[in-house]
Amino acid sequence: MRAARARELVAEGDQPTAVARVAQISRQAIYKPPRRRPPAAGPGVPGAADAAIVEIAKANPTDGTRMIAAIAGRELDEAINRKRVQRIMRTHRLLQPIRGLDRRRRPGFFRVTRPNELWHMDMTKVWTAQHGWVYLHAIVDCCTREIPAWTLDLRGRTDEAIACVESGVLGHRVSAGTLTLGTDNGTQFTSRGFRRHLSGRGITHRRGGYRDPESQAFIESWFGQFKKRVAWRAEWETINEARRDIAEYIDTYHHRPHSGLRYRTPTEVAQTWRTLNNSAT
């Protein structure tokens, strides 16, 4: 406002130097023509990218703005700013409350240098109408975040846990003496048969502390996301229906960005390691 009034005084014949001194502005502000801001776009009609971001956010209601931006960037093949995603999601009321940030934080426990060096394994249960509770064993590779093996059975005994380990070892051709398997202190994992099987396979068994889920952070996190995205929203009639949906979810999981991998996918990270190994041999 002072610059505009100063220009009016100069136009009426006053000296620019004196006007600038009294108005406490620079002479450049008097001589420089005012720059008009373009009119605000207003709500208007959203572009194709904005509409795509909305659809992605609706399809992934448990994900935050960073993950939605990463997924949208891949699908649209362009860089998507997180703040843009946040603005769009806020406009469409798609933002979720941020969970408490005062939860206990610890320095990283795990230092892995290659795939098949450290696996985390655990068991959870899901509900089916016909069979009641059924038991899901799953293993996550702490390097690539892939799921090397999983099983869904009517029981959660030692035999089912061993079968899951065998599936992962055979499927990934794990050599003896190269793998450490981390579990909690569940009865099937502390059983004599399970420990004997790991010893026979040359697998080092590392058990976490009691009431310490952070010692199994990767598999606990994976189960948490699986339950939010699939298990709590599903109504399975039979165990076969559950197996079908879990298999589909794991395939999708392998090809979606992972925040722990700097928003690369587990499949991409695993392929990078395979390429490095092939070039080294």
Where are these regions (language model features)?
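Short, amphipathic alpha-helical "recognition" segments used to contact nucleic acids or chromatin
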Residues: M1-D14, D50-A59
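Residue-level signal for the short linker/turn that defines the boundary of a DNA-recognition helix
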Residues: G13-Q15, D63, E237
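Mobile-element integrase/transposase regions
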Residues: E78-V140, E160-S167, G171-T178, T281
